[in-house]
Design a protein with these regions (language model features):
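Short beta-strand->loop
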Residues: 109-131, 186, 219-237
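An extracytoplasmic/periplasmic, membrane-proximal ligand-sensing/linker region
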Residues: 21-22, 32-41, 46-63, 245, ...
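Bilobed "Venus flytrap"/periplasmic-binding protein-like clamshell domains
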Residues: 35, 40-63, 75, 131-197
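C-terminal motif of bacterial Sec signal peptides marking the signal peptidase cleavage site
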Residues: 15-19
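Hydrophobic residues within well-ordered alpha-helices
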Residues: 85-86, 152, 200-201, 257
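A ligand-binding cleft/hinge motif common to bilobed small-molecule-binding domains
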Residues: 94-108, 173-177, 201-202, 206-226
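Acidic, polar ligand-binding/catalytic clefts
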Residues: 83-151
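Extracytoplasmic small-molecule ligand-binding "clamshell" domains
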Residues: 28-101
Length: 302
């Protein structure tokens, strides 16, 4: 009888302990992130020091709108931006479509907005047509005998970082679709679309891939740039750049951040600032499926 009592007590204790252990091992979902301050990341499409000066006014506007301290971070390249999102050191990122897809597929970022901008005509003049896409272009010197993509074989071509949508992925994928392999051209990587054009004008490269139309950015310093160069190819439409956030950001703050950027873009001061940084003229809501074509081109290059 005593032995039976002892066995019953032992079983009860075992069940209780086991139950407590199972409770401890239950994985509770992580709480959504509610920021006390925000770090906004930017990628240089021009000289980093110039960009840093341009983003400072936006820093203050965002802080006023969101009522939290905001600081800016100029990432060295797309990879460091994605790593910043993964490590939660960057909360909001101005990133290209390709970088967004890489960050999202790595469970590091969610897209909030894509930018809107005015189309630029073939002479570098801004039209009044506001769109949510742009194109990449391949530019050569006017006196060059390069007139088609096939002519780029064995030529020195300036490209951006490997995660750049218009400066690497789309132009390279376009070449590959035409049967020109990566090894068929001499790739020279540059930092900044303006630097690629300068390398072209200085005869350091024979062609350069830029967004359409990066030449307009150099028009002030080189009024003859359109007479000195020609475009031999323009790609298919590319979704505009994104404003994305770390993937654990709370829905409340996602909405708050989206609203802040849209509201800022509707003010005269705010519109001037965002236009000065990347040429953005406003923002619209975006969803992940908007970037499926970007994934397709990314896979071609990979």
């Amino acid at each position: 009888m005593k032995r039976l009592k002892f066995l019953v007590i032992y079983l009860i204790i075992t069940i209780i302990v086991s139950g407590c252990s199972n409770i401890d091992n239950v994985k509770h979902p992580k709480e959504a992130y509610t920021p006390k301050s925000l770090t906004v990341g930017f990628i240089p499409s021009q000289n980093a020091q110039i960009l840093n000066a341009k983003v400072k006014p936006l820093q203050q506007l965002l802080s006023d709108e969101l009522e939290v301290p905001v600081k800016v971070h100029i990432a060295t390249n797309y990879n460091t931006m994605i790593e910043g999102l993964k490590s939660k050191k960057i909360d909001i990122a101005f990133i290209s479509p390709v970088s967004y897809t890489l960050a999202h597929d790595a469970h590091a970022a969610d897209v909030l907005l894509k930018s809107k901008g005015y189309l630029v005509d073939n002479k570098g003049n801004q039209t009044h047509h506001l769109v949510d896409y742009y194109r990449s272009q391949i530019v050569v010197r006017k006196d060059s005998n390069i007139n088609h993509l096939k002519d780029l074989k064995d030529k020195r071509v300036a490209l951006q970082d490997v995660e750049s949508t218009s400066g690497y992925i789309y132009p390279l994928a376009s070449l590959m679709e035409k049967g020109i392999k990566k090894s068929d051209i001499q790739i020279q990587q540059v930092k900044g679309h303006d630097q690629g054009l300068i390398a072209l004008l200085n005869h350091d490269v024979e062609a350069v891939a830029t967004y359409q139309d990066a030449r307009a950015d150099l028009k002030k310093d080189d009024p003859d740039i359109y007479q000195e160069t020609k475009v031999i190819y323009r790609t298919k439409k590319i979704p505009n750049d994104t404003i994305s956030v770390r993937n654990d950001m709370s829905n409340k703050w996602k909405k708050k951040i989206s609203r802040a950027f849209i509201d800022i873009s509707h003010t005269k001061k705010g519109k001037h600032i965002i236009s000065d940084i990347y040429g953005h003229q406003g923002y619209e809501k975006a969803k992940d499926s908007d970037f499926d074509t970007v994934r397709k081109y990314r896979d071609i290059v990979d």
